[in-house]
């Protein structure tokens, strides 16, 4: 794979997309969906919805799917059955979803992997065209974690020094998909810091976190909300934040820029979708149901507990499409610079 020259990244417009990620206030929360109720169109839905989740139940997607399903049910009375279909960094779940009836009874949770997959291969579903985004409800940054009781290193500088001494034998738990946000970011980090690290692949969150906890890997790449329980329990600690400034909740943790890395960070976003061919009146009801669910106390408490109020996490359908389309363009530029076969 061709070496990425980090100085090129500013030309890709990551500063512009980061500004969009940060758009909106992250101060006092104000619900942007004022309509507290909506009549069911021709009785839809008359039964429970199904939510396909293309990742395991323990990771970030599993957690947000559970929280959003609870919020939607709480204010509409409509039950949602979650169907986890992990594998292929989201491709298994996406394939299953696109094969389901486009009647509005099946919705999809997905992350930025859907955008990056389409950026690499345009035959893959485009989340802003083949799907209708109901709501983007999480936008967040990533960190690198170590065990709190680790004795070989205790911060980024000592970790980087130790990694260099291992001659390429050090390991980090990450997702499996080449070209994903996580993999691309790790490539940026290793090139900028001059490190050689073996990335050990896990598509499900639980084994990924267990690998660090049990000592099978030396570090973990993840988002803070996904490992909140390990942080609160004192099991994991962050040593590097991949963001342009230090979030107040991690004020003592250096950013990649603090450590001399100049690339613009790629951020994780998660949301909910319905098939583009679903009946329009059903789509309208689902948009209201999911966007209003974002405002529910249970969901707001969930997002706050996952550090999801540091960045404005809310996008309605129009805002989600802008975010997705910008992301596709940015990833496509990065992949070309990486020498990947962009189709």
Where are these regions (language model features)?
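Stable alpha-helical elements in mature extracytoplasmic
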Residues: 60-64, 68, 93, 112, ...
């Amino acid at each position: 794979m061709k070496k990425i020259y980090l100085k090129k990244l500013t030309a890709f417009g990551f500063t512009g997309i980061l500004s969009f990620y940060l758009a909106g206030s992250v101060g006092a929360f104000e619900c942007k969906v004022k309509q507290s109720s909506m009549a069911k169109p021709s009785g839809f839905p008359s039964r429970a919805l199904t939510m396909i989740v293309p990742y395991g139940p323990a990771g970030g997607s599993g957690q947000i799917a559970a929280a959003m399903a609870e919020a939607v049910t709480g204010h509409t009375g409509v039950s949602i059955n979650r169907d986890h279909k992990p594998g292929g960094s989201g491709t298994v779940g996406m394939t299953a979803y696109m094969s389901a009836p486009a009647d509005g009874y099946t919705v999809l949770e997905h992350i930025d992997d859907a955008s990056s997959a389409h950026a690499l291969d345009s035959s893959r579903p485009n989340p802003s065209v083949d799907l209708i985004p109901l709501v983007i409800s999480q936008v967040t940054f990533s960190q690198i974690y170590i065990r709190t009781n680790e004795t070989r290193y205790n911060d980024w500088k000592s970790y980087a020094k130790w990694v260099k001494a291992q001659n390429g034998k050090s390991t980090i738990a990450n997702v499996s998909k080449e070209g994903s946000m996580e993999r691309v970011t790790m490539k940026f980090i290793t090139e900028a810091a001059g490190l050689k690290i073996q990335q050990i692949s896990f598509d499900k969150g639980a084994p990924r976190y267990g690998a660090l906890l049990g000592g099978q890997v030396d570090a973990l790449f993840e988002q803070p909300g996904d490992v909140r329980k390990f942080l609160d329990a004192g099991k994991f600690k962050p040593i590097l934040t991949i963001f342009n400034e230090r979030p107040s909740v991690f004020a003592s943790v250096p950013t990649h820029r603090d450590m001399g890395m100049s690339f613009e960070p790629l951020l994780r976003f998660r949301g909910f979708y319905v098939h583009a061919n679903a009946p329009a009146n059903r789509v309208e009801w689902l948009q209201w149901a999911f966007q209003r669910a974002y405002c529910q106390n249970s969901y707001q408490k969930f997002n706050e507990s996952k550090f999801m109020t540091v960045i404005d996490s809310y996008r309605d359908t129009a805002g989600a499409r802008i975010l997705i389309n910008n992301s596709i363009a940015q990833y496509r530029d990065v992949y070309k610079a990486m020498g990947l076969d962009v189709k």
